[in-house]
Protein backbone atom coordinates (compact mmCIF):
# COMPACT_ATOMS: atom_id res chain seq x y z
CA UNK A 1 0.00 0.00 0.00
CA UNK A 2 2.88 2.35 0.74
CA UNK A 3 6.18 3.12 -0.91
CA UNK A 4 7.19 2.18 -4.42
CA UNK A 5 5.47 -1.22 -4.36
CA UNK A 6 2.24 0.51 -3.36
CA UNK A 7 2.67 3.01 -6.18
CA UNK A 8 3.21 0.15 -8.65
CA UNK A 9 0.13 -1.69 -7.39
CA UNK A 10 -2.00 1.45 -7.60
CA UNK A 11 -0.77 2.15 -11.13
CA UNK A 12 -1.49 -1.39 -12.33
CA UNK A 13 -4.91 -1.36 -10.66
CA UNK A 14 -5.80 2.05 -12.15
CA UNK A 15 -5.16 0.66 -15.66
CA UNK A 16 -7.25 -2.46 -15.04
CA UNK A 17 -4.28 -4.76 -14.52
CA UNK A 18 -4.08 -7.74 -12.20
CA UNK A 19 -2.10 -7.48 -8.95
CA UNK A 20 -1.11 -10.28 -6.61
CA UNK A 21 -0.15 -9.30 -3.09
CA UNK A 22 2.08 -11.61 -1.04
CA UNK A 23 2.31 -10.67 2.62
CA UNK A 24 3.41 -12.47 5.79
CA UNK A 25 0.80 -12.96 8.53
CA UNK A 26 2.62 -10.56 10.85
CA UNK A 27 2.22 -7.67 8.39
CA UNK A 28 -1.33 -8.50 7.33
CA UNK A 29 -2.80 -5.68 9.41
CA UNK A 30 -5.37 -3.05 8.43
CA UNK A 31 -3.77 -0.26 6.43
CA UNK A 32 -0.66 -2.21 5.40
CA UNK A 33 -1.58 -4.35 2.35
CA UNK A 34 -2.92 -2.79 -0.85
CA UNK A 35 -6.67 -3.22 -0.49
CA UNK A 36 -7.41 -3.58 -4.22
CA UNK A 37 -5.22 -6.60 -5.01
CA UNK A 38 -6.77 -9.04 -7.47
CA UNK A 39 -5.45 -11.78 -5.21
CA UNK A 40 -3.92 -11.65 -1.73
CA UNK A 41 -1.70 -14.49 -0.54
CA UNK A 42 -0.90 -14.53 3.17
CA UNK A 43 2.22 -16.49 4.09
CA UNK A 44 3.51 -17.80 7.40
CA UNK A 45 6.66 -15.66 7.37
CA UNK A 46 9.11 -13.72 5.20
CA UNK A 47 10.87 -16.89 3.99
CA UNK A 48 7.60 -18.31 2.69
CA UNK A 49 6.74 -14.91 1.20
CA UNK A 50 9.95 -14.80 -0.83
CA UNK A 51 9.55 -18.41 -1.96
CA UNK A 52 5.99 -17.66 -3.07
CA UNK A 53 7.04 -14.53 -4.96
CA UNK A 54 9.89 -16.42 -6.64
CA UNK A 55 7.53 -19.21 -7.70
CA UNK A 56 4.94 -16.77 -9.11
CA UNK A 57 7.39 -14.44 -10.86
CA UNK A 58 8.74 -14.57 -14.39
CA UNK A 59 11.12 -11.68 -13.74
CA UNK A 60 12.29 -9.27 -11.05
CA UNK A 61 12.76 -5.51 -11.00
CA UNK A 62 14.62 -4.11 -8.00
CA UNK A 63 13.32 -0.66 -7.15
CA UNK A 64 15.14 1.72 -4.81
CA UNK A 65 14.66 0.35 -1.30
CA UNK A 66 16.21 -0.67 1.98
CA UNK A 67 17.74 -3.78 3.50
CA UNK A 68 14.72 -5.97 2.69
CA UNK A 69 15.00 -4.99 -0.96
CA UNK A 70 18.75 -5.72 -0.97
CA UNK A 71 18.17 -9.10 0.67
CA UNK A 72 15.57 -10.02 -1.95
CA UNK A 73 17.89 -8.90 -4.76
CA UNK A 74 20.79 -10.98 -3.43
CA UNK A 75 18.54 -14.03 -3.11
CA UNK A 76 17.26 -13.90 -6.69
CA UNK A 77 20.78 -13.28 -8.01
CA UNK A 78 22.03 -16.30 -6.05
CA UNK A 79 19.12 -18.48 -7.22
CA UNK A 80 19.82 -17.45 -10.82
CA UNK A 81 23.55 -18.09 -10.40
CA UNK A 82 22.93 -21.58 -9.03
CA UNK A 83 20.31 -22.41 -11.65
CA UNK A 84 17.33 -22.70 -9.31
CA UNK A 85 15.50 -20.02 -11.29
CA UNK A 86 15.95 -18.69 -14.80
CA UNK A 87 14.53 -15.20 -14.73
CA UNK A 88 15.56 -11.68 -15.65
CA UNK A 89 16.71 -9.41 -12.84
CA UNK A 90 16.68 -5.69 -13.55
CA UNK A 91 18.10 -3.16 -11.14
CA UNK A 92 16.19 0.10 -11.57
CA UNK A 93 18.96 2.60 -10.88
CA UNK A 94 16.79 5.70 -10.70
CA UNK A 95 18.94 8.79 -10.31
CA UNK A 96 22.02 6.65 -9.61
CA UNK A 97 20.47 5.19 -6.44
CA UNK A 98 22.33 1.88 -6.87
CA UNK A 99 25.64 3.27 -8.21
CA UNK A 100 27.52 2.28 -5.04
CA UNK A 101 26.05 -1.24 -5.05
CA UNK A 102 26.97 -1.69 -8.71
CA UNK A 103 30.52 -0.50 -7.93
CA UNK A 104 30.64 -3.04 -5.10
CA UNK A 105 29.64 -5.84 -7.50
CA UNK A 106 32.52 -4.77 -9.77
CA UNK A 107 34.88 -4.75 -6.76
CA UNK A 108 33.75 -8.27 -5.78
CA UNK A 109 34.50 -9.51 -9.30
CA UNK A 110 37.90 -7.77 -9.44
CA UNK A 111 38.84 -9.27 -6.06
CA UNK A 112 37.84 -12.75 -7.22
CA UNK A 113 34.89 -13.15 -4.84
CA UNK A 114 32.39 -13.10 -7.69
CA UNK A 115 32.89 -14.61 -11.13
CA UNK A 116 32.81 -11.91 -13.82
CA UNK A 117 30.05 -13.84 -15.65
CA UNK A 118 27.85 -13.29 -12.59
CA UNK A 119 27.81 -9.60 -13.47
CA UNK A 120 25.60 -10.67 -16.39
CA UNK A 121 22.97 -12.13 -14.03
CA UNK A 122 21.33 -8.72 -13.88
CA UNK A 123 20.87 -5.70 -16.05
CA UNK A 124 20.56 -2.06 -15.06
CA UNK A 125 17.86 0.36 -16.18
CA UNK A 126 17.62 4.10 -15.66
CA UNK A 127 13.96 4.47 -16.68
CA UNK A 128 10.82 2.37 -16.28
CA UNK A 129 10.66 1.94 -20.05
CA UNK A 130 14.22 0.63 -20.14
CA UNK A 131 13.42 -1.79 -17.30
CA UNK A 132 10.55 -3.25 -19.36
CA UNK A 133 12.82 -3.53 -22.43
CA UNK A 134 15.43 -5.38 -20.35
CA UNK A 135 12.81 -7.81 -19.02
CA UNK A 136 11.57 -8.53 -22.53
CA UNK A 137 15.10 -8.87 -23.97
CA UNK A 138 16.40 -11.16 -21.19
CA UNK A 139 19.19 -13.57 -22.10
CA UNK A 140 20.51 -15.93 -19.46
CA UNK A 141 24.17 -15.51 -18.56
CA UNK A 142 26.51 -18.38 -19.41
CA UNK A 143 27.85 -19.34 -16.02
CA UNK A 144 31.12 -21.18 -15.48
CA UNK A 145 30.87 -24.98 -15.63
CA UNK A 146 32.28 -25.28 -12.09
CA UNK A 147 29.20 -23.49 -10.72
CA UNK A 148 26.86 -25.73 -12.70
CA UNK A 149 28.75 -28.85 -11.61
CA UNK A 150 28.66 -27.80 -7.96
CA UNK A 151 24.88 -27.33 -8.11
CA UNK A 152 24.35 -30.67 -9.87
CA UNK A 153 26.59 -32.41 -7.34
CA UNK A 154 24.71 -30.84 -4.43
CA UNK A 155 21.32 -31.80 -5.92
CA UNK A 156 22.47 -35.39 -6.49
CA UNK A 157 23.82 -35.58 -2.94
CA UNK A 158 20.62 -34.10 -1.48
CA UNK A 159 18.41 -36.51 -3.44
CA UNK A 160 20.40 -39.58 -2.37
Predicted segment positions?
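A cross-family phosphate/adenosyl-ligand binding-site feature
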Residues: 1-56, 95-129, 133-134, 138-160
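Short glycine/serine/threonine-rich phosphate/pyrophosphate-binding segments
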Residues: 2-7, 68-75
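A glycine- and small-aliphatic-rich helix-loop capping segment at beta-alpha/alpha-beta transitions
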Residues: 13-15, 75-83
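Thr-Gly-centered strand-to-loop micro-motif
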Residues: 43, 62-64, 92
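Short glycine-/polar-rich loops that comprise or flank the Walker A/P-loop
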Residues: 58, 85-87, 120
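Short, glycine-rich nucleotide/cofactor-binding loops
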Residues: 60-70
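Glycine-rich phosphate/nucleotide-binding loop
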Residues: 63, 84-87, 95-100
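Arginine/glycine-rich "motif VI" loop of SF2 helicases in the C-terminal RecA-like domain
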Residues: 79-87, 113-115
Amino acid sequence: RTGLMGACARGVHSKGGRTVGVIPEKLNQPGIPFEHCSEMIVTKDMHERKATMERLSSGFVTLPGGVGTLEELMEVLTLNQLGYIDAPVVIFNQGGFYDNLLAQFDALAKAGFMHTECLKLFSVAATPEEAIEKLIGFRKAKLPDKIKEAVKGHEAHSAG
